[in-house]
């Protein structure tokens, strides 16, 4: 089972700008929802032959239900500004502290093209590939739903994924890449996705 709970994160992080207090508030709020779901899952398991394998606590965003906005509510600054790393770390710590049977990533996900605020900051270039890679040191994923110019070369992709792999090996943690080269689009041009789960953004020049 999994959660789409960026709204819960936003409410908890908006309650305090002290990292320890915000982390505790998130642990409490998300923990209440998680335990309630786990109780339901346990009852279903008893009544059926289904096996409850655990709960992925990753607070997945979806467009306007934004994890980027939740982080900005804590930092009082645009995503990518100083304080973003701290917010990412405290969210991750809160998730890991919730006493339920966890499965999947159970970590912070920052998918650029699935979150209105993240896509907006990408367009504004307040956050870059290298920053997203740095945040992955304290998150559950690596480079997640990153839009790239369609003329990116194989060598550039190799270097980008290689940097992520280097970090994964150094930190002894799995990281993944969902990179989206947009065919026919160049840097400074805007994507034109019509997918209901994706947000459009302006492509950044490659570093």
State each model region's role:
Residues 1-207:
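Anaerobic metallocofactor- and corrinoid-dependent redox/one-carbon enzyme cores
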């Amino acid at each position: 089972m999994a959660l789409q709970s960026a709204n819960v994160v936003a409410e908890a992080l908006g309650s305090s700008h002290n990292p320890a207090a915000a982390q505790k508030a998130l642990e409490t709020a998300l923990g209440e929802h998680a335990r309630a779901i786990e109780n339901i899952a346990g009852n279903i398991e008893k009544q059926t032959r289904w096996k409850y394998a655990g709960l992925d606590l990753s607070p997945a965003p979806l467009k306007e239900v934004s994890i980027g906005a939740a982080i900005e509510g804590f930092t009082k600054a645009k995503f990518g500004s100083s304080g973003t790393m701290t917010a990412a770390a405290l969210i991750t710590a809160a998730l890991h502290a919730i006493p339920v049977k966890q499965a999947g990533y159970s970590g912070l996900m920052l998918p650029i093209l699935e979150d209105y605020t993240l896509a907006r900051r990408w367009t504004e270039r307040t956050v870059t590939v290298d920053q997203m890679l740095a945040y992955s040191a304290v998150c559950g994923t690596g480079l997640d739903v990153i839009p790239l110019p369609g003329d990116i070369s194989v060598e550039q992709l190799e270097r980008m994924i290689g940097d992520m792999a280097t970090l994964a090996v150094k930190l002894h943690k799995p990281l993944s890449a969902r990179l989206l080269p947009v065919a026919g689009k160049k840097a400074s041009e805007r994507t034109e996705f019509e997918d209901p789960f994706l947000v459009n953004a302006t492509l950044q020049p490659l570093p």
